[in-house]
C-alpha cells in the first residue's frame, strides 16, 4: 500500500505541486477523491482540523495545509536545500509562491470575468521576483535555490504552469523563467506525469475556470 494518501477534490488545485513532487521523486501515493456532494454533507469537513482540504496522510501522520505538507515532504525527501541558509531561501521562495497563488485563487473564485484583464496586466510585476531569483543563482540555469531541486521548485513550477493556461505568453518577457519551466517539465518523471491522463484530465480549479 502506498505510504502517502492525498484526500482532495477532483481538481489540481493545491495538490498538484505535491503530486509533481512525489512523481519526480519516484514515490507512490493513493488518491481519495472527494466530490462536492460528499463534501457538502459535512461529515468529512467536521473531522478536518481546519474544516478544509487537502488532507494528507503519511503513515500514521495526518497533515492539513498544503504548504505544511510540502515542507514535510521537503524535509522527508531531502528537498529543503543543503544547509540552513538554503532552507531559509527555499522558505522565502515558497512564501512568494503562496502570495501569488492566493491572488490567483481570489481571481478564479471571486472575480474572474471582471478581474482577469487587470490581473494579467499586473502579472509581470508578480513574476519578476522569481526571474530575479533565478538570475542570482548560477545565471538562471539551475534551480530556484542552490544546485539541487527543492519543494519550492515544484510549487513554483505548478504556479507557472497554471498561469500559462490563464495567460499564454505570460513568460515571454521572462527568458529565465521560461527556460526554467521547460527544463523542469522535461525531467523524465515530471514529463511523464504532466502527460498522464490523471494530470491532463484533472481540471485546475473546481468552478470550471481554467
UniProtKB/Swiss-Prot annotation:
N6-succinyllysine modification, residue list: 103, 116
Domain of life of the source: Eukaryota
One Pfam family this sequence matches: GST_N
Gene name of this polypeptide: GSTP1
Residue intervals of the GST N-terminal domain: 2-81
GO molecular function: glutathione transferase activity
Keyword presence, Transport: no
Binding site for glutathione: 8, 14, 39, 45, 52-53, 65-66
Entry keywords, A to Z: Acetylation, Cytoplasm, Lipid metabolism, Mitochondrion, Nucleus, Phosphoprotein, Transferase
Location in the cell: Cytoplasm; Mitochondrion; Nucleus
Quaternary structure, from the entry: Homodimer. Interacts with CDK5.
Modified residues (Phosphotyrosine): 4
PANTHER family named in the record: GLUTATHIONE S-TRANSFERASE, GLUTATHIONE S-TRANSFERASE P
GO CC terms in record: cytosol; mitochondrion; nucleus
Modified positions (Phosphothreonine) in chain numbering: 62
Protein family per UniProt: Belongs to the GST superfamily. Pi family.
Listed GO biological process terms: glutathione derivative biosynthetic process; glutathione metabolic process; hepoxilin biosynthetic process; prostaglandin metabolic process
Name of protein: Glutathione S-transferase P
PTM annotation (N6-acetyllysine): residues: 128
Function according to Swiss-Prot or TrEMBL: Conjugation of reduced glutathione to a wide number of exogenous and endogenous hydrophobic electrophiles. Involved in the formation of glutathione conjugates of both prostaglandin A2 (PGA2) and prostaglandin J2 (PGJ2). Participates in the formation of novel hepoxilin regioisomers. Negatively regulates CDK5 activity via p25/p35 translocation to prevent neurodegeneration.
Amino acid at each position: 500500500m502506498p505510504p502517502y494518501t492525498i484526500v482532495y477534490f477532483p481538481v489540481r488545485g493545491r495538490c498538484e505541486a505535491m503530486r509533481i513532487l512525489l512523481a519526480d521523486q519516484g514515490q507512490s501515493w493513493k488518491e481519495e477523491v472527494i466530490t462536492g456532494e460528499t463534501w457538502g454533507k459535512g461529515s468529512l469537513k467536521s473531522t478536518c482540523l481546519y474544516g478544509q482540504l487537502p488532507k494528507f496522510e503519511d503513515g500514521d501522520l495526518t497533515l492539513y495545509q498544503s504548504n505544511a505538507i510540502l515542507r514535510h515532504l521537503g524535509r522527508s525527501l531531502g528537498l529543503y536545500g543543503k544547509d540552513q541558509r538554503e532552507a531559509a531561501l527555499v522558505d522565502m521562495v515558497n512564501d512568494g509562491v503562496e502570495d501569488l497563488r492566493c491572488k490567483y485563487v481570489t481571481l478564479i473564485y471571486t472575480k474572474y470575468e471582471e478581474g482577469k484583464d487587470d490581473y494579467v496586466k499586473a502579472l509581470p510585476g508578480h513574476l519578476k521576483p522569481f526571474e530575479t531569483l533565478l538570475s542570482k543563482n548560477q545565471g538562471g540555469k539551475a534551480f530556484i535555490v542552490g544546485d539541487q531541486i527543492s519543494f519550492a521548485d515544484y510549487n513554483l513550477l505548478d504556479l507557472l504552469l497554471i498561469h500559462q493556461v490563464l495567460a499564454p505568453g505570460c513568460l515571454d518577457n521572462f527568458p529565465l523563467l521560461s527556460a526554467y519551466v521547460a527544463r523542469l517539465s522535461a525531467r523524465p518523471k515530471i514529463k511523464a506525469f504532466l502527460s498522464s491522463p490523471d494530470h491532463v484530465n484533472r481540471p485546475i480549479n473546481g468552478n470550471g475556470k481554467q
